[in-house]
Amino acid sequence: MDLKLVFRIAAVIAAINGLGLLFMGATFFAMANMTATPNLITVGQFTGVTVLFLALLQWRIPDIAGDAFSSLGQLFAIGYAMWFLIVGYHIMTGQAGGAAAYGNLVVEAVLAVLFYMQSKKSE
């Protein structure tokens, strides 16, 4: 496995989440034990488009980053660690739960570690 593959895996996962938020917001929020109000679905749709943009960015970074490739991998390691912390906090405080929240927690932890390890190898 190399850093390019980690970016591509993260991009596919982000695209799935982005499309889910955009087109199946009520289902996504229900899986996280949240009540899907019309306002929450609207915010979810906006977030879905944002996550789709991040997926596109993650897919393209290996091709366009040049000398900054390893540094961007380290930056994404920090980003995934931050997502891990906020989802963990939401689980601990009871604001999110269920398989979706725990699944995201695991995925974010794995991606944070992979981004960090592979970016160090690429230096």
Can you describe what each PLM-predicted range is?
Residues 1-12, 69-72:
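Interfacial segments of alpha-helical transmembrane regions
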Residues 22, 59, 88, 112-116:
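Membrane-embedded alpha-helical segments of multi-pass transporters/permeases
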Residues 63, 85-102, 120-121:
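Membrane-helix boundary connector in multi-pass membrane proteins
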Residues 33-41, 70-71, 96-106:
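Non-cytosolic membrane-interface motifs at loop->transmembrane helix junctions
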Residues 109-123:
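Membrane-water interface at the C-terminal end of transmembrane alpha helices
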Residues 3-6, 14-41:
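Membrane-helix boundary elements
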Residues 15-22, 39-62, 75-82:
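Core segments of alpha-helical transmembrane spans in multipass integral membrane proteins
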Residues 72-87, 107-110:
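Hydrophobic alpha-helical membrane segments
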